[in-house]
Amino acid sequence: MGIASSLRLFGKAPASYLFNGFRRQMKNPLMKKGVVYAGVSGTCAAAGYMFGNFVMEKHIYQVKYTEEQEKEVLEVENRLQNLKIVKDLRQNPSFRELRMPFNRSNHSLTNNLLSGPGRITVPPVIFYDKSTRQVYAIAHVGKDVGLDDDTIHPGLIATCMDEVLAICSFLSLPNKIAVTANLKLSNPTKAYTNHFYILRSHLEWTKGRKAQTHGTAYMLDNEDPSKSTCVAIADGLFVEPRFAKYLKHVIPVSLP
């Protein structure tokens, strides 16, 4: 069905008037350029949106490492998989395992900018229990994020604790989405680079769209991983936005 025949649905006179007016406007060079630009822009926008979704879905962001960096990653990954706590939690049927590949989200600090050799070396392994609202995260922090004395800035510890506490709050909120309303952190002792860290959190209470969580961070001894030192104690209050149900499609992590 052509444009003219389609417009006849509104009556003969309106159809003729609208179609003739459209033809006159299309003879204007500026109008033609506008239509062409609009078509090209719309096509590019649609293609970009579709490709972006494909990339996010298929995890095809490429990360290139040097030979030395690959050795570091493989060594840390092997040590991570052999940690006793990882093996124990993996065998515990109450816990589910979650691991988000690096560069899964362009808007994540720890999963993008701070990820890779010398930083957060490999993707942290996360275990969570929906029934008890407990979360464990095991991560390795490399030398490149350290200060002059090889200590880790408390801000990085606070960022990591905030994310682990947030995951814990997701387990108790209807739409599994929340934003940080308040975060309190104390550092009993210094944290150092080139160590594995265990971040733990549990739910204290929920009320409506609010969830209060508590967590701790432990630095494992490199010589004897069974020994650990508490480097952070945190309390976080998280609030689910009123429009949270409309944000599910933009959250890079889902908790099945």
Curated annotation (Swiss-Prot):
One of its GO terms (cellular component) is mitochondrion. SUPFAM superfamilies: Thioesterase/thiol ester dehydrase-isomerase (SSF54637). It is a single-pass membrane protein. GO terms for biological process: fatty acid metabolic process. It is found in: Mitochondrion membrane. It comes from the Eukaryota. The keyword ATP-binding does not apply. This is UPF0644 protein PB2B4.06. It comes from Schizosaccharomyces pombe (strain 972 / ATCC 24843) (Fission yeast).
